[in-house]
A protein has these predicted regions:
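Short, surface-exposed structural microsegments at secondary-structure boundaries
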Residues: 1-130, 136-142, 262-277
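Eukaryotic C-terminal
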Residues: 1-4, 25, 123, 130, ...
Length: 277
């Protein structure tokens, strides 16, 4: 019979302090999950045990390549997860600390969400309390994320204990007033939704999850030249309404527990970064 690890022979409260130290992510509760670059994946390909998937390069070439996900190391101090491989009991205890005490930020690497949670056991998935996602502009025809978004929402239905989803929505509008509607009302959103306008199909998917206790909406607004096309006019008006009438529509009409959040996180959008977060 295998000897019990020394770690299990010390009081549980001491073990919790050890987990707290080893799984400290540089003093922050945030863990960023992202796609590995092509070069990173090729260098570590033979060692990976995680699910692999294909993504498109964010370049003009738009080539597809195989990759997997990884945790972005915290510059100040990286977690030491080796302790989780000692035995099953220690892994269960450490997993409880790792997944309940941290928020997982996927940014706009939505491709990583489904494999990340698919690689976890149902018990581990139920430990996750908080995640954040970056939703590219609903009118973004250059880098649409509609297929990934549908898969993400189906995956999130399996997170039975998810307390908080922070959704950063990309938008763009001119710095000065423009000719055309300056914002959208709740009635406007109702019309767009009822006609299945592409700008709100993502909300239909989000409403189908039904298990999230709180959805925090944050706008990431970039500068836009004076809008001249119908698509740009919709984008500008939509962007002005993300944290106001859109939140009201999501909450009151779709039953999503939405509220406005603080702009603490920016993703990487096709309009470029407008501020440092």
């Amino acid at each position: 019979m295998a000897e019990e690890p020394a770690l299990l022979r010390i009081p549980p409260e001491i073990r919790m302090l050890i987990y707290d130290y080893l799984l400290d992510n540089g003093g922050t509760k945030d863990i960023s999950i992202r796609n590995q670059s092509r070069s990173e994946y090729e260098a570590l390909r033979s060692k990976t045990k995680r699910s692999v998937y294909n993504i498109m390069e964010r370049s003009i070439a738009k080539k597809s390549y195989e990759t997997t996900y990884c945790a972005e190391p915290e510059p100040r101090r990286s977690m030491d997860v080796a302790i989780m491989h000692i035995n099953r009991k220690i892994r269960e205890e450490a997993s409880h600390f790792l997944y309940t005490k941290h928020a997982f930020h996927f940014g706009d690497d939505l491709e990583a969400v489904v494999p990340f949670f698919a690689d976890k056991t149902p018990r581990t998935r139920d430990l996750v309390r908080e995640i954040s996602l970056y939703k590219r502009s609903p009118t973004n025809a250059i880098e649409p994320d509609s297929c990934d978004w549908s898969s993400v929402c189906r995956s999130l239905r399996n997170l039975q204990s998810l307390d908080k989803l922070t959704l950063v929505i990309e938008g763009a509008r001119p710095r000065e007033p423009w000719d055309g509607p300056q914002s959208l009302t709740v009635s406007d959103f109702r019309l767009l939704y009822s006609t299945r306008h592409e700008s709100l199909e993502w909300a239909r998917e989000l409403a189908s999850i039904g298990t999230i206790r709180e959805v925090v909406i944050v706008a990431d607004i970039h500068n836009l030249p004076n809008p001249e096309s119908n698509m740009m006019l919709v984008l500008a008006a939509f962007s002005s309404s993300i944290e106001t009438s859109l939140v009201d529509f999501l909450r009151d009409d779709l039953g999503i527990p939405a509220r406005m959040g603080q702009p603490q996180y920016c993703g990487v959008g096709v309009f470029g970064r407008s501020k440092k977060c």
